[in-house]
Amino acid sequence: QGEAVQDKAEGSVYSTGNTGSGTVGSNTGNSKTEENITDNSPPSSEGLKYETIATANGSYIKIVGYEGHSANVLVPAFIHDIPVTYIAGGAFKNNDVIRTITFEGADDLSKRQFYLPASSNCAPAVFYNLPNLTKITFPYELSCGRYLADYSLYSYNESWRYLFEGTPKLAAIETTSKPSKADTASRRYAYMTSKDGVLYSSYLDGLYFYPYAKKDKSFTVPYETLYVFINDCFYLEELRINATPSHYFDFNILPSNTHLKKVIAEGGKPFETRYWTDGDVLFSRQESTTANPKAVSVAYYPQTKNDKAYRLPDIPEGYYYNIINQFNLNTYIEELYVPARAKVWAGMTEKSYRPPNLRAIHLQEGNPMSQSDIDDFTRHGVNIDYNY
C-alpha cells in the first residue's frame, strides 16, 4: 500500500490500481522506434508517479512523473477516491513513445478542480520534449488558478506556450464535455474549452493556444473571441477575424511565428468598420465618437512581408495614424513613407521597437514630428526627410 508519510505519500499508478512507494520500473523503453509503437492501444495509467498531499481542507494528488511505456496515457480524475488536482512541471518529459495524453474529467465539479502551472517559472515545462505527442485531452475543469479568473489574460500567452515546449507534432488540444453554464457562471474565465483542436476560455472569449502542428493554412477566429494568442504555428498562413467585433482584439503573435502572412478582417471597409485589411496589413479604427480626429492604428504588419519600403495609405480628413509601432518584427523594411496626419512613435528610436534594418522615414510636409524626435532618429541611424 505504499509507505505512510504524515504529510505526503509517493506512489505509482498501475492499471490494476495497486500502489507502491518510490519509482516502479525504469525508463527503458522510452526510445522505442515508431515501428514498435501501437498508436491505437487502449489508454493506460501504468507508470504514473504521484504525490498525495494532505491539507486542512482534505487530501489531493499531484502528478509528478511518468515512467510507463504506453503510446496513449490516461490520467484518472481520482486515485483511491482522492482527486487528482495538480500536475507538476516535467511530469511528462523526454519520451518519444507517447502519442496522446488524456486527463479524465470529473462528473461533479464540486469534487475537484484541475490546475496546470501556467508559469514560465515552472521548470521544466509540464509537457517537455515529447516529439511524437499529437493530442492532449484536458478535463473541462482545467484551470490555471485565480490569474485566469480575473480576466487578466494578455500576459499568459508565453505561459501557455511554455507548457508545451518541445512538442512539434502537437496538432490538437481537446476538452471533455463541459458542465452547464449554471455550473460555471461564477468562474466563467477560469475554465477552458476546445473547438476544432484549439484551446479557449470556457465561453470562447480568449484563444489561448493554437497547436503547433495544426495543419489548417487558414483559421477563422470565432466572433466571441477577443484575445488572440498565436504561437509558432508551422502551417498557419492566414488568420481571419470579424471586422466588427464587440470589443477590440488583443493580439499577441509571437516574433518567432514566421509563417503567418496576413490577418484578414472579413467584411472590413477602410475607416468604416473597426478593422479592415489593406493588402496584407491590418488596420483598426478607434470607435470613440468623441475623438476628433479619430485615431487609426496599424494593428498587424506581417513579419513575412518582404517589401523594402512601405507607404501608409492616404488617410481622409478627420482621421490620423496614431503611434506607428507595428513594424519592429519585420526584417525586410528599410523605408517608411508617412503622411502628414500621422504620429510616429518616438520610442521607435529604440532598437527593440523599430524594424532592425530601417534606415529612412519619409514624411509628408506638415507631419508633426518634433525636431528632438528627428534628432533622436538621426542619432540612431534613421534618416528623416520630407520626400514623401
Residue ranges: model-predicted function:
Residues 47-59, 68-86, 95-121, 128-158, ...:
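Structural signature of tandem-repeat unit edges
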Residues 1-2, 6, 88, 292:
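Short, intrinsically disordered, low-complexity terminal segments
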Residues 2-41:
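Ser/Thr/Gly/Pro-rich low-complexity, disordered linker/stalk segments of secreted
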Residues 65:
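Charge-lined substrate channels and their catalytic hotspots, especially those that engage the 3′ end
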